[in-house]
Amino acid sequence: MPSDFISLLSADLDLESPKSLYSRESVYDLLPKELQLPPSRETSVASMSQTSGGEAGSPPPAVVAADASSAPSSSSMGGACSSFTTSSSPTIYSTSVTDSKAMQVESCSSAVGVSNRGVSEKQLTSNTVQQHPSTPKRHTVLYISPPPEDLLDNSRMSCQDEGCGLESEQSCSMWMEDSPSNFSNMSTSSYNDNTEVPRKSRKRNPKQRPGVKRRDCEESNMDIFDADSAKAPHYVLSQLTTDNKGNSKAGNGTLENQKGTGVKKSPMLCGQYPVKSEGKELKIVVQPETQHRARYLTEGSRGSVKDRTQQGFPTVKLEGHNEPVVLQVFVGNDSGRVKPHGFYQACRVTGRNTTPCKEVDIEGTTVIEVGLDPSNNMTLAVDCVGILKLRNADVEARIGIAGSKKKSTRARLVFRVNIMRKDGSTLTLQTPSSPILCTQPAGVPEILKKSLHSCSVKGEEEVFLIGKNFLKGTKVIFQENVSDENSWKSEAEIDMELFHQNHLIVKVPPYHDQHITLPVSVGIYVVTNAGRSHDVQPFTYTPDPAAAGALNVNVKKEISSPARPCSFEEAMKAMKTTGCNLDKVNIIPNALMTPLIPSSMIKSEDVTPMEVTAEKRSSTIFKTTKSVGSTQQTLENISNIAGNGSFSSPSSSHLPSENEKQQQIQPKAYNPETLTTIQTQDISQPGTFPAVSASSQLPNSDALLQQATQFQTRETQSREILQSDGTVVNLSQLTEASQQQQQSPLQEQAQTLQQQISSNIFPSPNSVSQLQNTIQQLQAGSFTGSTASGSSGSVDLVQQVLEAQQQLSSVLFSAPDGNENVQEQLSADIFQQVSQIQSGVSPGMFSSTEPTVHTRPDNLLPGRAESVHPQSENTLSNQQQQQQQQQQVMESSAAMVMEMQQSICQAAAQIQSELFPSTASANGNLQQSPVYQQTSHMMSALSTNEDMQMQCELFSSPPAVSGNETSTTTTQQVATPGTTMFQTSSSGDGEETGTQAKQIQNSVFQTMVQMQHSGDNQPQVNLFSSTKSMMSVQNSGTQQQGNGLFQQGNEMMSLQSGNFLQQSSHSQAQLFHPQNPIADAQNLSQETQGSLFHSPNPIVHSQTSTTSSEQMQPPMFHSQSTIAVLQGSSVPQDQQSTNIFLSQSPMNNLQTNTVAQEAFFAAPNSISPLQSTSNSEQQAAFQQQAPISHIQTPMLSQEQAQPPQQGLFQPQVALGSLPPNPMPQSQQGTMFQSQHSIVAMQSNSPSQEQQQQQQQQQQQQQQQQQSILFSNQNTMATMASPKQPPPNMIFNPNQNPMANQEQQNQSIFHQQSNMAPMNQEQQPMQFQSQSTVSSLQNPGPTQSESSQTPLFHSSPQIQLVQGSPSSQEQQVTLFLSPASMSALQTSINQQDMQQSPLYSPQNNMPGIQGATSSPQPQATLFHNTAGGTMNQLQNSPGSSQQTSGMFLFGIQNNCSQLLTSGPATLPDQLMAISQPGQPQNEGQPPVTTLLSQQMPENSPLASSINTNQNIEKIDLLVSLQNQGNNLTGSF
């Protein structure tokens, strides 16, 4: 810019040689100066900006340039210089010092020069130079812009400016005309005047003159200041000084003279000087405060600037010098090169105790001078300096209008000393302080009072806030947790029309959660630019009264609505409508409807909000939280199903305590009051499961919880249940959400389907073929219907799973014909043993339940076993009839047991409720109803009708003990065994400690459990549910492999446990037990778990306690138990159970632990990967499984309950093999042979437990063997094949022979495969209708797979899970069903959030599997398992956890969708997925249908995340497990 350039030049010129400048300026005359005027002004502005820049250093060059430039430039330079000189104060100051010379020179040059000299004093020599030609210009300048630039500062420029363009001040010209001193005096005065007086009248006053004398110095300073221009209003200073010091004009004059000398001595204010030089240092010992409100000219003193403590004052010390000197203090700019401030001046503060000081004006800037004395150690606390805010007019005059536009409210105190050297020269030291904010701090806003303290969640009410400092830009914030930035907060709308500094009117924003049931307290605070109000006012959001009823209703609706979208009345009507169904088809209607009825009844009763809630829950449970209510209902159903082996079991379970139950059921359906009574009865008589389920099938879980807790507690527990249920509901509610949608259809369809199923299944039990047909119909039609309703999602999943399991059971029932005898024998033996064991165990498990349990196991199991044999012999219908009868007995026992359990497991019941709910949730009813029902159902189906009945008894009667047992026993074990289950976790953990593998497994398992717990931790109940679920899911998974395991996590378990467990799936109790055995194994010692899984416990106990004694049972149970044993073997039962659990969870965990993920993958994936990856642990886990299978195989071979055992084992190995014992036996023979080989490889221990243990150990040690063993099972796991050729035997059959050994080995695992292929064909249905069962059943019938399928039918879900190679989709499908389980597991494993999507878990699992060592095979397996979900769930017990929760939600919600959407495709996709590698992606799209969303997401992630996540998950699991241990302990 010209001005900048000129200012530089002018400053330089000035600095360099005032004389030459002067002569040039005189040469140039006014025009040039006027020309320069604008420049000078600009310069002043520029110089202001540049002054600092061009002050000291550039002067000579600038001068040259200035010389080179014309007079105008020099004159403007003068202005610039003046402004510049400010910046280059040193030079300029010297110039001003030179001013005397300059003045002399100027005076020599001319009067103008003289006056210029005065100007130069005022301004700079350069200004003078410029101005002495431009003296008139000064007039012009002053005249032109006296006010703006007449600040001599600028006016130094100004003066120059005056000379240059500020000459407007005639006075200046006058002064110029006058003697320079006069002029300087006058101009100085005029500056003062300007400040004090209107600019026009700024002409000289007497005052000014004295000021002027000072001004001479001051003016020179001013010139400098001008250079500084904006930042030090010298006017005010002058005025102040003149006013204040006007009296001492003489003194001022003296000062002037002194300053004349002093000026010569003291450098210009804009000069830059060192802090330290020649061994002398001026330093600030105490910095001034950071904020000091400057005083205005018109107000009184604001006091001196204090230090930051407000107790003292800024302190300065001069080091290296011991002679008295004068300390100068002025106000400088806030940053950059030091120069006087344009808006603030220093002012003297006087008081009684202040240090004496004097105020001088240098270059238009007020400078406070204080003496530094050696007596004070050359240290001074500066307590006499204040800060003065200049008037805008003074600012403009001082720095020009342009400069005055740049507001700066920060300033620094500048301390300077001039030390005389011996040679007469001056050493100047200068140091600036830290910046001081010179404005009043904005008041912090404050709320003093508000007109409203609470408001409904809808908000929109007006609140009047009275307070302080509500400034522009104020915001009123409502925040939930003020200490948490991430908590909910919302800005209230302010009525700006009524906005005031002291009051505001705002509208309350709506609360984010419109469905709160309790008042929520939030904070209100005000935020302004100055910050937020220090005080946070409390404000309360209350539940919406309108919505409150609705809310309660909503809760009820949410809970019951999921069961049935209809209103409660509608639900009641529907229930009543289905009342016939309830009575007629008590199976589902009671199961399904009863919960609704209880809810509606309870609602009708409105016994208590809690009951209503419980009711809701029961509805909800029914929905998915059905899990909770359904949990017991499911238990009921399960026991019923278990008892009947079909849904008729619910009726039979209602039948069992038909008096109570039918009454209860009917009362439930029809009698709210009775319901209350019934509920009470339920509480008192948990034994009456139907009652329980009737009274609260939500309460069933509640019943467990509530009954356990008792209705009194029930309210609390209802909430707890609601809470746990909520958890379950969270788990289940997602499920419920889907199931809610799905449940009306589900209930309707499920009821219809289940009625059909119960009608079909149960009628079909009349003829096995009918069952098969019905099952096929169900699969094809019903399941399609189920799928149709399944589109509803989880409900359908549940239904599908249930139906699939029912179909399985019917198929199993029908298929078992050949196998029935064997299975019957096995069942009889097993169940007898189980009964015995259960009797033995159940006492342990259910000490109070013992009689019931004994009765049940003895009566039910033996009776059942006996009746089962005849029944299986006679037919399913006989079996079912007997089962029903037994179930009735069982249910009565179960009711007793339940009561016992409830009493025993009140706490456990809560846990279990939660467990079950979460399991139910996880199973999404799939697991619970499906798991238990299906598990019992499936397991019984898996076992055979006999087994089923047996299992039903196991499950039914043990479910009363088993289903119940799982539920009750589980509950009790939750309490005791349940605790055991969780203790299984816990114990398992404890026992785990026994063996690291065990620990790992247990920890993994528990971690899984706990992860599940954590994942499902929402309620630990869920945890437990989850754990239980896990156990259940995993165990149940195991069950549900047979059952719904595949449905969810169980699939994984299915694969792992499932195969084995499912192999022993006919001994589904065993399966269940294996779960429990796993749990049992974990809690194995805790024989309660035996009770828990009475059959399995016996198995576990048998295996653990009597490995061989219960060989028949062991075979069955060994299959499971073997798993348990195997798992529990090395570290006996904990490991066993852990392993079993590990099979899914622990094994996964083992896998997780070892290869964490692989284990996970391997677990379901097949154990192989587990083996391969975490061979030792996995192997342990899988070995346990494999050993279980092997053990089972050996058991089969050893026990040679091989036909039965094979049936059993095959059920496990080839779940389908049970029904197709003949073929499957060969197949199984192959399977088992390979497995046997594996077993043999592993080591055939006479005692399965030993084998298991050995195998576990061996597996752990002999990973290969295990791999082989597992491979055999892992045959299931394609991993085995990739991993090991021997496993490939089985495995290859899995992969390649999928058709071959798939049928045989795969029969076990690959039956899935075959089933997968077949299932692929049928799997669409299977998938759709949980076709797994269907497919399994259908394929089973279709091929030897029919036997295999029966196997898989037995554990079709296993097939699904295991049908991984070809029908991983199936697995997915089942898995989906298991999804619930998986969901549980997932939620359990939810911590392993790596698979967020349910299905993505599947993909993840595959991905994870892919990530793992034999991931692809595993992936395949898992893909098989499509259940990757499951795998993931299980695989990533850690990772699954996330999945788990997600799974629950996802699967249950997505379950039917998954099943539905992926019917045909899923199997293929699953199969594709099951095919390691690529298929995953292929399969994913269809799987995507079910799994795709999650799968695609997860599979990439899964693989990448797989290993690390698994490891992390393992760690998580371990930590979780530890937590779980604590939890279990606490539970």
UniProtKB/Swiss-Prot annotation:
The protein's role, per its UniProt record: Transcription factor involved, among others, in the transcriptional regulation of osmoprotective and inflammatory genes. Binds the DNA consensus sequence 5'-[ACT][AG]TGGAAA[CAT]A[TA][ATC][CA][ATG][GT][GAC][CG][CT]-3'. Mediates the transcriptional response to hypertonicity. Positively regulates the transcription of LCN2 and S100A4 genes; optimal transactivation of these genes requires the presence of DDX5/DDX17. Also involved in the DNA damage response by preventing formation of R-loops; R-loops are composed of a DNA:RNA hybrid and the associated non-template single-stranded DNA.
DNA-binding region coordinates: 293-300
Cellular component terms per the entry's GO annotation: chromatin; cytosol; nucleoplasm; nucleus; transcription regulator complex
Species of the source: Homo sapiens
Keyword tRNA-binding in record: no
Phosphoserine sites (modified residues): S120, S134, S155, S561
Keywords attached to this entry: Acetylation, Activator, ADP-ribosylation, Chromosome, Cytoplasm, DNA damage, DNA-binding, Isopeptide bond, Nucleus, Phosphoprotein, Transcription, Transcription regulation, Ubl conjugation
Lineage of origin: Eukaryota, Metazoa, Chordata, Craniata, Vertebrata
GO terms of molecular function: chromatin binding; DNA-binding transcription activator activity, RNA polymerase II-specific; DNA-binding transcription factor activity; DNA-binding transcription factor activity, RNA polymerase II-specific; RNA polymerase II cis-regulatory region sequence-specific DNA binding; sequence-specific double-stranded DNA binding
Protein location: Nucleus; Cytoplasm; Chromosome
Name this protein carries in UniProt: Nuclear factor of activated T-cells 5
Chain positions with N6-acetyllysine modification: K122
